[in-house]
Amino acid sequence: PFLVKEEKILILALESEDQKQITDAIKSTLKSCIQTRGVKVEDLPTFDIEYIFLNIRGKSVGESLDVMVTCPDDGKTQVEHKIYIDEIKVEKDKKHNRDIKLDNTLTLRMKYPSLTQFVENNFNTSADDNLESSMNVIASCIDVVFNEDESWAAVDCTKKELNDWLETLNTNQFKEIETFFDTMPKLTHIIKVTNPNTKVESEVVMEGLTSFFG
């Protein structure tokens, strides 16, 4: 369970509103709490990290969260809402598929971003532009490219080789890769809120760990 040390690190990270600091705090907390041998926190998919962390926190410091939610109808009124942690699930889109058909013979198999990749690609201190950063994320999630006769593993390629190969794809092929990320499993919860000023009831979709600590 959480100790005072872990809770203090987490609170300071959340108060900073710095995503990298929050991510590092989550990683540190999970390493302290997970007893299973062979589990490498850095290699777990981001959505597994978020789900495990949320449930460890729930068992340790309370099984509900009070969050501030902005009412969609006016975009400014905030209301407090209680969420029970056991109701928050990792949702997978039915259209999601790790295998992407690039043409009649070639298939690209993707893997999910790990926490390590998430931090490296989102909080790099160099002055990468958004396009380059996005390409790096995609390249880091390539697992293997294969056809009926051969396969080419991403681990055998350099980062530059992967990025150069991505640039040879056409628009439709690239859109299929974007769909992989858009539909990949997410920590998701749908709540209903009523604006006290307008009396309008709306549904709000909350996604990702930081949504539940707002």
Task: Name each region found by the language model.
Residues 1-214:
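Short, surface-exposed, charged amphipathic helix/loop patches that serve as local interaction elements
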